């Protein structure tokens, strides 16, 4: 009798992918990257195991947003002091720290659990075209669509 294949840490092969964010739409890129980080693009995907690959995103400063999201979408954070709420629009965040904009978007699409945190640590975002991960021999990844 055959049994359903269940992946575990010992039989997972991880790859490194480089994705160029120049000219890509924020949400479409984020959902694709979140899927790669979770391992859903593999036939051996197992929900309770971190089977995803490493992702390097370059040119994060050239990401695009559709519609009026640059001026209307607001990100909030709080300092835990009374009256300590801070806000920044997506356009301001893209100018100030484009890497953080992509990280917030992608990590928001991962599960909010210990497994999701582990999957989020395999994401590396850089504003320019250079990255320090040449030793891992990353492959270029072509996005769908």
Curated annotation (Swiss-Prot):
GO MF assignments: mRNA binding; structural constituent of ribosome
Pfam families per record: Ribosomal_L13 (PF00572)
Keywords assigned by UniProt, alphabetized: Ribonucleoprotein, Ribosomal protein
A single Gene Ontology CC term: cytosolic large ribosomal subunit
Database matches in InterPro entries: Ribosomal_uL13, Ribosomal_uL13_bac-type, Ribosomal_uL13_CS, Ribosomal_uL13_sf
HAMAP family: Ribosomal_uL13
Family: Belongs to the universal ribosomal protein uL13 family.
Protein's job: This protein is one of the early assembly proteins of the 50S ribosomal subunit, although it is not seen to bind rRNA by itself. It is important during the early stages of 50S assembly.
Protein's name according to its UniProt entry: Large ribosomal subunit protein uL13
């Amino acid at each position: 009798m055959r049994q359903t294949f269940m992946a575990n840490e010992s039989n997972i092969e991880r790859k490194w992918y480089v994705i160029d964010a120049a000219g890509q739409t924020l949400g479409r890129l984020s959902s694709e990257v979140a899927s790669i980080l979770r391992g859903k693009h593999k036939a051996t995907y197992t929900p309770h195991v971190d089977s995803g690959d490493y992702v390097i995103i370059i040119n994060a400063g050239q990401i695009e947003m559709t519609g009026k999201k640059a001026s209307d979408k607001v990100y909030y954070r709080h300092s835990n002091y009374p009256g300590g709420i801070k806000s920044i629009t997506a356009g301001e965040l893209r100018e100030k720290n484009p890497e953080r904009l992509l990280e917030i978007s992608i990590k928001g699409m991962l599960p909010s659990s210990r497994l999701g945190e582990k999957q989020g640590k395999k994401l590396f975002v850089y504003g320019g075209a250079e990255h320090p991960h040449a030793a891992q021999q990353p492959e270029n990844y072509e996005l769908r669509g």
